[in-house]
Swiss-Prot record:
Keywords: Cell outer membrane, Ion transport, Iron, Iron transport, Membrane, Receptor, Signal, TonB box, Transmembrane, Transmembrane beta strand, Transport. Residues 74-183 form the TBDR plug domain. Residues 189-729 form the TBDR beta-barrel domain. This is Hydroxamate siderophore receptor FhuE. It is a multi-pass membrane protein. Residues 1-36 form the signal peptide. A motif (TonB box) lies at residues 42-49.
Length: 729
């Protein structure tokens, strides 16, 4: 098989050696792969910049990335576990939101709070760092601003770095950092595609992606991506309408200078969303089960979100091998919602609801509530850094250094009212026909501003031809001002990684970084928990083949933390349902991950991964047992050599048993979801050179499963279908 190799000197070199690993996998898993087109003796040289993000538009892998260190490298050179979800995989698997991407990414698990809110975890800890083009946004789970609903039509790929990522983000849990890479205007000719999709629950989706030069020489280019989606749901009364748009201009201002500037808009309007799930427990300790269509949302409930972002990137090359990059962004995310939740136990005799605080006395027998919440999150961020190579002791090395500043303001308002048993009546007869609250004026619920200033640097030193050392550090000044208190912290996060090249295809690595994470969680008295501190260690083995078209990673990790927030399962007294947490010291998460991703042959793409970890506190108690300790995820596509117009594929996601023990007035109950697998299928037929039809089936066997054993019952998505027509020009 012909390919090129991205080497350690940031150059592309032609190679004609076939991939032994790819051949072995192909022969073992699919004998027909042996009949793929044979290699020829002709050498093909691919010219391109070392910063080219992708060497195959139809691959599940990419050639190089700056994830983890901001230095452009192959994944094999990064001493951490990295997963990249490419545009082709998102199209094959119909991963249309950030949440859907994370659900199908190795090592990431989900806890679904209701119809639209979900928390995502890796290695046992919540993911709280979400970046766009390397600029982070921090969000709180209490407020639903639609982060996981970001539409992937606007993005080229998603990069996931697992473990602590303090060198990139300054603060954060040792879970993972998610970076969404925007689409850019890369074509000097007019090109594009339009698609229409129709599916289960009256889904309709239309997307256009167009590129065009704005000048005759193509040095100024534009790209517009726009779309509209409307769908109902398996949940009664639910409807979602989404509009999204991105416009970007990329300009070559000279031979050494490029400028990108753009605007992003997303609007998501949801009618009758749920706020929490269905009551799990009866008063006798038995658990409930419901039809998956059952919803606690009344007809008048809604949750509307609007996202506006402007952004720019300026790049300047200098001194032959150096480049300075300035990223800037301003984003505003607004939401407005009126919803209803039920938090109660069911009396099996008559279906009447009993509140969790009924034994506190009169006035405490409420069984839920209604809330009118609104607010805005504003983020202003700048990031300036330079990276390049230098020579020392006769060897080439790499250096990156820079600084960043971000200001994030969260300002939210709320009005709420309690619901009492007689207002609902028997829950067995509840159908969402509930009168809208006579709302009181909203009051200020939260107003806080977080400032973060950082200086960072890292160098990749070639100690010997096969041995590379990465050293780095990030100094962070973090300050938050809230309605009730102010806090300022200074922290330096060290980073060290060692990579040893075993041969042309295999490397082994070790890495270390510290952990620093201020927390927004509060204890039962309403006080904020102290920052999380700790250490992250990782050892691994990586390989890449065919110019990184196929990559593998085997990683062993150990995470040590103090002051980790763990849910108590009860709300903070006097709060609007906010869960109380306790700080747990001596928390250790340790485990192993394996991933294979990319092209097995020119016709066969495969991503396969498995994760196993254990997370315990210093007393041996499981931390977050509501998260699966073992997961396996696989997705593949295969283009038939005998009928190259036809591509078939599918995948499976499996997780082991999860549970949560909940203390109630009636005793301690255990909520449990056994292990289960979800199977998906897809096929695509290239009808003409420009037009294709694709069909997808998700949850093929219509598995019923609970996505949130930590709280009320929230069922996962039932079996669903879609068909998509795409025209390229």
């Amino acid at each position: 098989m012909l390919s090129t190799q991205f080497n350690r000197d940031n150059q592309y070199q032609a190679i004609t050696k076939p991939s032994l690993l790819a051949g072995c996998i192909a022969l073992a898993l699919l004998p027909s792969a042996a009949f793929a087109a044979p290699a020829t003796e002709e050498t093909v040289i691919v010219e391109g910049s070392a910063t080219a993000p992708d060497d195959g538009e139809n691959d599940y892998s990419v050639t190089s990335t700056s994830a983890g260190t901001k230095m452009q490298m192959t994944q094999r050179d990064i001493p951490q576990s990295v997963t990249i979800v490419s545009q082709q995989r998102m199209e094959d698997q119909q991963l249309q939101t950030l949440g859907e991407v994370m659900e199908n990414t190795l090592g990431i698990s989900k806890s679904q709070a209701d119809s639209d809110r979900a928390l995502y975890y890796s290695r046992g800890f919540q993911i709280d760092n979400y970046m766009v083009d390397g600029i982070p946004t921090y969000f709180e789970s209490r407020w639903n601003l639609g982060d996981a609903l970001s539409d992937m039509a606007l993005f080229e790929r998603v990069e996931v770095v697992r473990g602590a990522t303090g060198l990139m983000t300054g603060t954060g849990n040792p879970s993972a950092a998610i970076n969404m890479v925007r689409k850019h205007a890369t074509s000097r000719e007019f090109k594009g595609d339009v698609s229409a999709e129709y599916g289960s629950w009256n889904k309709e989706r239309y997307v256009a992606d167009l590129q065009s030069p704005l000048t005759e020489d193509g040095k100024i280019r534009a790209r517009i991506v726009g779309g509209y989606q409307n769908n109902d749901s398996w949940l009664d009364r639910y409807n979602s309408e989404k509009t999204f748009f991105s416009g970007i201009v990329d300009a070559d201002l000279g031979d050494l200078t490029t400028l990108s500037a753009g605007y992003e808009y997303q609007r998501i309007d949801v009618n009758s969303p749920t706020w929490g799930g269905l009551p799990r427990w009866n008063t006798d300790g038995s658990s409930n089960s419901y039809d998956r269509a059952r919803s606690t949302a009344p007809d008048w409930a809604y949750n509307d979100k609007e996202i506006n972002k402007v952004f720019m990137t300026l790049k300047q090359q200098f001194a032959d091998t150096w480049q300075a990059t300035l990223n800037a962004t301003h984003s505003e995310v607004e939401f407005d919602s009126k919803m209803m939740y039920v938090d109660a136990y069911v009396n099996k005799a008559d279906g009447m609801l009993v509140g969790p605080y009924s034994n506190y006395g009169p006035g405490f027998d409420y069984v839920g509530g209604t809330g009118w919440n609104s607010g805005k999150r504003k983020v202003d961020a700048l990031d300036l850094f330079a990276d390049g190579s230098y020579e020392l002791f006769g060897r080439q090395h790499n250096l990156m250094f820079g600084g960043s500043y971000s200001k994030q303001n969260n300002r939210y308002f709320s009005s709420w009212a309690n619901i009492f048993p007689d207002e609902i009546g028997s829950f067995y007869n509840f159908n969402g026909n509930f009168p809208q609250t006579d709302w009181s004026p909203q009051s200020l619920a939260q107003d806080d501003t977080t400032h973060m200033k950082s200086l960072y640097a890292a160098t990749r030193v070639t100690l010997a031809d096969p041995l590379h050392l990465i050293l780095g550090a990030r100094y962070t000044n973090w300050r938050v001002d809230t309605l009730t208190y102010s806090m300022e912290k200074n922290h330096t996060t060290p980073y060290a990684g060692l990579v040893f090249d075993i041969n042309d295809n295999w490397s082994t690595y070790a890495s270390y970084t510290s952990i620093f994470q201020p927390q927004n969680d509060r204890d039962s008295s309403g006080k904020y928990l102290a920052p999380i501190t700790g250490n992250n260690y990782e050892l691994g083995l990586k390989s890449d083949w065919m110019n990184s078209r196929l990559t593998t990673t085997l990683a062993i990790f150990r995470i040590e933390q103090d002051n980790v927030a763990q849910s108590t399962g009860t709300p903070i007294p006097g709060s609007n349902g906010e869960t109380a947490y306790k700080a747990v010291d001596g928390t250790v998460s340790k485990g192993v991950e394996f991933e294979l991703n990319g092209a097995i042959t020119d016709n066969w793409q495969l991503t396969f991964g498995a994760t196993r970890y254990i997370a315990e506190d210093n007393e041996g108690n499981a931390v977050n047992p509501n998260l699966p300790r073992t997961t396996v995820k696989m997705f593949t596509s295969y283009r038939l050599p005998v009928m190259p117009e036809l591509t078939v594929g599918g995948g499976v996601n499996w997780q082991n048993r999860v549970y949560t023990d909940t203390v109630t007035p009636y005793g301690t109950f255990r909520a449990e979801q056994g292990s289960y697998a979800l199977v998906d299928l897809f096929t695509r037929y290239q009808v003409t050179k420009n037009f294709s039809l694709q069909g997808n089936v998700n949850n093929l066997f219509d598995k019923t499963y609970d996505t949130n054993v930590e709280g009320s019952i929230v069922y996962g998505t039932p079996r669903n279908f879609s068909i998509t027509g795409t025209y390229q020009f």
